[in-house]
């Protein structure tokens, strides 16, 4: 959006990953060594421009620095230290909130304990930032029509398994021959086409439907 001079009304972030999410705001410490440690952006199919990682990161740093004073960000307290440090060093307006981690009515609720410390509002995220955006648009901003773009929760059939979102994590505790058990074929009646999904995306969809 920023590369086309489009300023979003609100940016949402809360993913705690220590090194990946920062890339959407520009990682000031990114180098060849850190890239070799994590092949996520090299193998994923979400944005092919990220394949040239150093060049794209440099572009994002410049774009975000240029437009940050016009950007409002709803930042979850679960965000990584890198993201927090980066955003607080810019001119972006930050609006803090707590991701709902469990039922706050429970006696030993972690969400309740965190709220007592910082007194920030709690939001049911649905497990991903797209669902969070939908919930904010619906419950907070009372939007009557909400369009969801890029929330496929699935992959095209010709997408290599190694390009899927959670492949690297699966490899750590699953044998190569058993990886296929984590994926399932699904049918989209609107597009009249088959796709495939993984158990995490399937859970995200279930949460959205509920």
Regions found by a protein language model. Give the residues of each.
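Metal-ion/cofactor- or nucleotide/acyl-coenzyme-handling active-site neighborhoods
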Residues: 2-210
